[in-house]
């Protein structure tokens, strides 16, 4: 850690404290994420080290760059490029989102980052507005924390005992699927897309069952016909209330028809029917976007 200096604590992430820091030689501002691993008596698991070293290879303009990994006895520090604004803060404070061109540009950049990660077989698993970071000067957006869930797992609570949000979690995960893949991230993107347009979360559940019911009451309760295999997922219950699906145009009323078409393809309950990131980038919703 000699080459890095902590400047101030800037937040508490899913895995530990996040500091604003400085590279002593270059003076570059960086973000230092301290990953706490108290439960590991024998130090940092080698699987985590392997996963994290793979992430250093990931380089894309829409992904927050992992610059370095510093390995201490009881913790790991991850050194990232520094960005001080996230999509949640931006949505809370900026009138920009009334302008659908901004929403479209941010959505496109999210998808571009995800397509890159998925092409390298890396999932995010915990996408939410708080880990989409924005560069104020250029309005460019970058995904943070990609691949960390695989290295460290997703805790139920953060180390400060805050509950990790369920609002963006895919139905197959909520239903206990052991094997899931890239569609889980596309579900999260759909939730974030709707939230940017509506300026409020689409499925703000406060428990796993409440989250499922919020999803089913809009998307319809799944069954073997609409989602083959759903009944054999560990947490599926045949006595779930049977909701019909609702027209998304009533749920996201200001979104145009091509936007609604894309959103509906991201929010398919059956993950095998969900659109993938590459196909989403080609969707007609983006045809009038000036791509930088």
UniProtKB/Swiss-Prot annotation:
First-tier enzyme category under EC: transferase
InterPro entries listed in its UniProt record: CDK (IPR050108), Kinase-like_dom_sf (IPR011009), Prot_kinase_dom (IPR000719), Protein_kinase_ATP_BS (IPR017441), Ser/Thr_kinase_AS (IPR008271)
Name by which UniProt lists this protein: Cyclin-dependent kinase A-2
Alphabetical list of PANTHER family matching this protein: CELL DIVISION PROTEIN KINASE, CYCLIN-DEPENDENT KINASE A-1
Residue(s) carrying Phosphotyrosine: 15
Gene: CDKA-2
Tissue: Expressed in the dividing region of the root apex and in differentiated cells such as those in the sclerenchyma, pericycle and parenchyma of the central cylinder. Expressed in the intercalary meristem and the elongation zone of internodes.
PROSITE patterns recorded: PROTEIN_KINASE_ATP (PS00107), PROTEIN_KINASE_DOM (PS50011), PROTEIN_KINASE_ST (PS00108)
Gene3D superfamilies the record matches: Phosphorylase Kinase, domain 1, Transferase(Phosphotransferase) domain 1
Protein family per UniProt: Belongs to the protein kinase superfamily. CMGC Ser/Thr protein kinase family. CDC2/CDKX subfamily.
Signal peptide coordinates: none
Upregulating conditions: By gibberellic acid (GA3) and submergence. Down-regulated by auxin.
Catalytic reaction list: L-seryl-[protein] + ATP = O-phospho-L-seryl-[protein] + ADP + H(+); L-threonyl-[protein] + ATP = O-phospho-L-threonyl-[protein] + ADP + H(+); [DNA-directed RNA polymerase] + ATP = phospho-[DNA-directed RNA polymerase] + ADP + H(+)
GO biological process: G1/S transition of mitotic cell cycle; regulation of G2/M transition of mitotic cell cycle; regulation of gene expression; regulation of meiotic cell cycle; signal transduction
SMART domains the record matches: S_TKc
Keywords: ATP-binding, Kinase, Nucleotide-binding, Phosphoprotein, Serine/threonine-protein kinase, Transferase
Occurrences of domain Protein kinase (ranges): 4-286
Phosphothreonine: modified positions: 14, 160
GO CC entries: cyclin-dependent protein kinase holoenzyme complex; cytoplasm; nucleus; NuRD complex
Domain of life: Eukaryota
The protein's Enzyme Commission number: 2.7.11.22, 2.7.11.23
Active site: 126
Binding annotation for ATP: 10-18, 33
